[in-house]
């Protein structure tokens, strides 16, 4: 099997991943997708199809939903607990392969989980030594893997293939060009973690093959090699692991494409029916006169000939308009609450509103749990690679998805109780923090410093 082979689960899901990516990119990507997203009507020429496609409106409910969900989770900064490795905190400001802070890395991971339902992250370090760093791999970059049951009876991955794109100097001497390589992570016969790159080479028949480089066995500072595990975490919306899980917004993306198709049909119908058609019966002389249309123009027609205007009358377009509205409401029901028409929500009771959002909140809680577990495992690996004890290392994401600041009256009662000594400093400041009475930039560590 060549290194370019795809896992069966990858092959089954890549069409869905492609659709979600294009939907999130917006109208341009959807239109460039052509008949993949908008079938060409029978008998329609290429020029007519291009006009048909351009008239369609793309209402990106999927991207709005995604941005809203990410914003709900990250309306408060993640809490990063390093325990005995607190001295490593400054290094978290530039801990990724592109020198981004850990909070930005965590946000990108959660965004990929919400959008694609799959993302991987690798802890790696320069071969000549240096600080370890995090590298993110999208769902499309995790091309193959092999799961086995280890001696402890647990299912683990003992081989993972990752597709990467390197920039190399152009043959012309100007700029750069992209080269696809494959990074293989695997466990050796001695159960130690190793990796190697597969670089492209041209074969005699002018096709591209791949040749492996030397095997590299990463070493942890003061602890030797990794044994029985790989410093790679694959995230999903329900749990971590190599199995492909369904994207949380797949249903919304599919409805988004269907809405685009209905919009194209509606605009197509409006284009041909909105403008009236003028008609006139020419005289019997055989000459065909030219008629100008305008407010200052009068047509003189000999009897018994006549003229008139043809205008569209019917319910067909109303059905298409109704279909578009129904799809928007369905997207709203699946989680795209930013798309929903809120004009009737003023009289809605809090119990009904809570019931409407309960399903979405439950999904967000599961996603936050999964992301937290994976980010915590990654951070522990990073701390170990830095030669420190990962005990008590933890990442905590926000679970307060709704803006619910403490009321002024409640704050007065809390402040009075604190002044009278009825509650201690820790309870006072932490309640202020959780009630959003402290600046949004504050973290749990800032609260501890106040105490």
Cite the ranges covered by each PLM segment.
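C-terminal helix-loop subdomains that flank or include functional centers
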Residues: 287, 295, 300, 319, ...
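Extended, regular secondary-structure scaffolds
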Residues: 114-237
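Extended, helix-rich architectural segments
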Residues: 1-137, 141
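Extended, charged amphipathic alpha-helical segments
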Residues: 211-351
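Hydrophobic alpha-helical segments and helix-packing faces
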Residues: 28-41, 45, 50-53, 58-61, ...
């Amino acid at each position: 099997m060549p290194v370019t082979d795809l896992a069966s689960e990858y092959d089954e899901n890549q069409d869905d991943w492609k659709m979600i990516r294009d939907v999130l990119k917006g109208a341009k990507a959807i239109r460039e997708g052509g008949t993949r997203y908008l079938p060409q009507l029978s008998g329609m020429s290429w020029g007519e199809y291009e006009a048909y496609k351009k008239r369609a409106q793309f209402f990106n409910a999927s991207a709005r939903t995604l941005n809203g969900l990410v914003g709900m989770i990250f309306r408060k900064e993640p809490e990063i607990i390093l325990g005995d490795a607190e001295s490593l905190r400054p290094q978290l400001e530039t801990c990724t392969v592109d020198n981004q802070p850990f909070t930005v890395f965590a946000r990108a991971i959660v965004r990929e989980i919400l959008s694609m339902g799959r993302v991987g992250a690798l802890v790696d370090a320069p071969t000549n030594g240096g600080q370890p760093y995090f590298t993110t791999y999208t769902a499309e970059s995790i091309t193959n893997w092999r799961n086995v049951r280890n001696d402890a009876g647990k299912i683990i991955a003992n081989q993972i293939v990752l597709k990467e794109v390197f920039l190399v100097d152009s043959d012309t001497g100007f700029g750069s060009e992209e080269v696809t390589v494959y990074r293989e992570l695997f466990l050796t016969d001695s159960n130690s973690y190793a990796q190697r790159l597969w670089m492209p080479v041209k074969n005699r028949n002018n096709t591209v093959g791949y040749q492996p480089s030397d095997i590299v066995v990463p070493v942890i500072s003061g602890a030797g090699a990794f044994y029985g595990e790989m410093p790679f975490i694959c995230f999903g919306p329900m749990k971590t692991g190599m199995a492909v899980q369904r994207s949380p917004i797949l249903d919304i993306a599919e409805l988004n494409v269907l809405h685009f198709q209905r919009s194209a049909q509606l605009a197509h119908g409006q284009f041909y029916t909105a403008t009236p058609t003028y008609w006139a019966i020419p005289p019997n002389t055989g000459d065909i006169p030219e008629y100008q249309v305008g407010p200052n123009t009068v047509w003189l027609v000999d009897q018994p000939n006549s003229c008139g205007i043809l205008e569209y009358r019917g319910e067909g377009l109303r059905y298409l308009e109704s279909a578009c509205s129904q799809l928007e409401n369905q997207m709203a029901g699946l989680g795209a609450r930013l798309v929903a028409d809120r004009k009737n929500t003023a009289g809605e009771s809090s119990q009904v509103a809570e019931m409407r959002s309960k399903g979405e909140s439950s999904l967000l809680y599961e996603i936050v749990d999964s992301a937290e577990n994976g980010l915590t495992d990654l951070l522990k690996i990073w701390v170990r690679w830095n030669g420190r004890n990962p005990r008590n290392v933890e990442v905590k994401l926000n679970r307060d998805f709704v803006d619910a600041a403490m009321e002024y009256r409640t704050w007065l009662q809390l402040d009075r109780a604190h002044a009278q000594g009825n509650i201690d400093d820790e309870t006072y400041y932490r309640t202020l923090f959780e009630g959003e009475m402290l600046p949004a930039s504050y973290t749990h560590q800032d609260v501890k410093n106040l105490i």
